[in-house]
Amino acid sequence: MSCSTYLSQPKQQLDMSYIVPLLKSPLEQYYLFQGGLKRTDLNDTKADTSTLAVSRYWENSSGWQKALNLRWRLDHYTQGTVTDTTMLLYPGVSVNRTRSRGGMMPTWGDSQRYSVDVSDTTWGSDIDFVILQAQNVWIRTLAERHRFVFRGNVGWIETNDFDRVPPDLRFFAGGDRSIRGYKYKDVSPRDSDDKLTGASKMATGSVEYQYNF
């Protein structure tokens, strides 16, 4: 069992997790139980969030990790000029893989993550949605010192009531791992009062060149 806290001016968070390994292959197959509380005050987002989740993980020799998830969350939030409370119960699937060579400053590597999450009022959620996400980072080095970092993220939310999608599930861009030169999560559509609303669709990409002295 583990417990972690994160404290900063825009976010305070408490997370707990418990892993139950399976006897057949305890390092590669296990259940993960999680719970958390979070308070956010960032840009035009204010939110209090409670979460619970149970996940079943599989890993294989190729490095791909697969998971089936069932998540519950309760959000009371203000996004821009809209204040609401949303309760969600939603299953999902995800696959991801991370590879690297070169220690703390990898000279070669990649990270890939793909996920689908589904919510429906049929089983008690406040809204229906389907959320698709793909996140990729590639690192390659030429002639020992010339390091290139490629990033690409795509997200899509299909829903019958976007205003009730919690801010954590909406898409915001900006920051050094998204669009450099913009504040963290400061790029999204804005409402008539020039407040950030978050987006239902997102596509970002970047290429960085780094020279290692």
Give names to the regions the model predicted.
Residues 13-17, 59, 90-213:
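Extended beta-strand-rich architecture
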